[in-house]
């Protein structure tokens, strides 16, 4: 009988522990969801506040000079663009969460895909005299969801351009073996401190809070990139040192396994 009691006690204790663990996990999930919503609200409100201030100051002034009017309109346009980027990033992320089960897999030429992305981003890099170089070691064709993978690579290269230094460089390399293909995005940028690297894939996490406004972006890019890569059963790693640039390495199976 004492044996039965002991078993029942052990089972009850195990159930209690399991339940507490589950509660803990739900609490963490709930906290991160609450934080996510408050971050979203903050991100969306910031450009709106700027727009309100700009338009109010135009409305309250008599006979505004044309130059000032144009300058304010330019600023307004920038804020609208910023708001648009935030909304697009959020939609991408929500879509990722929603379509985690639906992968539109097709056979894609990865070389062409990367070249197309770099062609789109080179004009942005050119503004700060940043050279974007693509090194392909072999032709690579893989089974991927083209839209999701494009989003991941675009975000990685965009970040490399954004957090770079004037007259810097971004080096993108593509390689493959018989099982996986590898994409490396290296830059000569500001780098990331060791204690920050664990957090950079979190939604809304920004390494450089002080410059986040002038650099722009939402802090969602890397979360989106990682989501897309994980959906391909791939992995992403980061190597970085402050002031010495950052390298992201991505590996993804050539053949998609659902």
Question: Which role does the model predict for each range below?
Answer:
Residues 78-86:
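Short alpha-helical segment of the dimerization/phosphotransfer core of two-component systems
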Residues 98-108, 112, 143:
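Short flexible loop/turn segments at helix-to-beta-strand junctions
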Residues 104-107, 126-127, 131-141:
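Conserved catalytic submotifs in the C-terminal HATPase_c
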Residues 187:
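Acidic ATP/Mg2+-coordinating residue in the GHKL
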């Amino acid at each position: 009988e004492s044996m039965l009691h002991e078993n029942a006690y052990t089972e009850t204790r195990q159930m209690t522990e399991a339940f507490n663990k589950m509660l803990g996990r739900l609490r963490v999930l709930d906290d991160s969801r609450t934080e996510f919503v408050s971050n979203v609200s903050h991100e969306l409100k910031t450009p709106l506040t700027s727009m309100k201030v700009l338009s109010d100051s135009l409305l309250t002034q008599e006979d505004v000079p044309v130059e000032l009017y144009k300058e304010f309109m330019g600023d307004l346009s920038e804020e609208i663009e910023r708001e648009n980027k935030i909304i697009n990033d959020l939609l991408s992320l929500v879509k990722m969460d929603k379509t985690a089960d639906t992968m539109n897999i097709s056979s894609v030429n990865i070389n062409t895909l990367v070249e197309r992305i770099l062609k789109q981003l080179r004009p942005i890099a050119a503004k700060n005299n940043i050279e974007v170089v693509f090194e392909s070691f072999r032709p690579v064709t893989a089974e991927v969801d083209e839209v999701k993978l494009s989003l991941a690579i675009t975000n990685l290269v965009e970040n490399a351009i954004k957090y770079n230094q004037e007259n810097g460089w971004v080096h993108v390399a593509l390689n493959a073996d018989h099982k996986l293909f590898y994409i490396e995005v290296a830059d000569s940028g500001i780098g990331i401190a060791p204690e920050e690297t664990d957090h950079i894939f979190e939604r809304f996490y920004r390494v450089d809070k002080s410059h986040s406004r002038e650099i722009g972006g939402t802090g969602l890019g890397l979360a989106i990139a990682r989501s897309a890569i994980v959906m391909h059963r791939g992995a992403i790693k980061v190597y970085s040192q402050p002031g010495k640039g950052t390298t992201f390495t991505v590996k993804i199976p050539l053949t998609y396994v659902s």
